[in-house]
């Protein structure tokens, strides 16, 4: 739809320019006619006056002086009074209106078409930059380095395998229970409730991340699970409690 609109605007602008040029030519001709016609009687009158002055005054030197005086006023009167009135009133108005009209058409067409492209570019750039790289780049480095130290120091791998299977099935609540039953309460039964809470939090956080294979393969689950991204700073702040719980487990073993 944009191409026919532009072609129509161009055709209209060309037609308007042709009409305006014709009008300007006609006005110039009319102004020339007005400038030539009314000046002729004035010139004739001045010549008649000069002749009368010549007849009245005697001598050769006398007619030379009135020529200078009488011929000088008609020249500014003929050039200034009729011609500028016609030329200044008609031509500048038409030229200004025509130029402004053509410029307005071109400016309007430029204004209507130009802002559409930068908006599309800006929206595409912002959406692409915000959606794809942030989701992929931020999630992968968080998952890969944190899973390796969690899995290496702990000896028993049986509850983790069960947790990964349950994570694939979709039930998140019993994972924390299996971890608490498997490691937390068996390794430190004499610990206070304060440490047991931290241990439960650490195991529940690990259950959210689960195994690397399941998390990487299930891309829609990463997008649909905001708590994993929200809980990551909490886990970083609980690093001290993790180290203490790991030391206690190592001492008990």
Swiss-Prot record:
Q: Where is the composition biased (Basic and acidic residues)?
A: 17-30, 45-60
Residue ranges for the region (Disordered) are 1-192, 212-253
What are its GO biological-process terms? sorocarp development
Q: Where is the composition biased (Polar residues)?
A: 215-235
Biased composition range(s): Low complexity: 1-14, 63-104, 111-154, 236-253
Q: Give the protein name, as stated in the record.
A: Putative uncharacterized protein DDB_G0284619
């Amino acid at each position: 739809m944009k191409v026919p609109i532009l072609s129509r605007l161009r055709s209209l602008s060309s037609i308007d320019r042709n009409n305006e040029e014709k009008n300007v030519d006609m006005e110039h001709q009319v102004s020339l006619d007005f400038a030539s016609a009314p000046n002729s009687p004035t010139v004739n009158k001045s010549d008649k006056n000069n002749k009368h002055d010549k007849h009245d005054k005697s001598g050769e030197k006398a007619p030379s002086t009135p020529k200078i005086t009488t011929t000088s006023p008609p020249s500014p009167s003929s050039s200034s009074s009729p011609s500028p009135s016609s030329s200044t009133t008609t031509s500048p108005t038409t030229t200004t209106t025509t130029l402004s009209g053509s410029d307005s058409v071109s400016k309007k067409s430029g204004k209507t078409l130009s802002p559409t492209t930068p908006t599309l570019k800006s929206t595409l750039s912002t959406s692409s930059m915000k959606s794809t790289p942030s989701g992929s780049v931020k999630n992968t480095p968080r998952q890969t380095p944190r899973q390796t130290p969690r899995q290496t120091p702990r000896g028993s791998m049986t509850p983790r395998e069960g947790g990964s299977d349950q994570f694939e099935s979709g039930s998140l609540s019993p994972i924390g229970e299996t971890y608490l039953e498997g490691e937390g309460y068996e390794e430190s039964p004499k610990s206070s409730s304060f440490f047991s809470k931290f241990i439960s939090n650490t195991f529940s956080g690990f259950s959210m991340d689960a195994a690397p294979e399941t998390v990487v393969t299930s891309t829609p689950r990463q997008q649909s699970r905001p708590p994993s991204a929200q809980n990551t700073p909490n886990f970083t702040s609980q690093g001290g409690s993790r180290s203490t719980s790991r030391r206690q487990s190592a001492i008990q073993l």
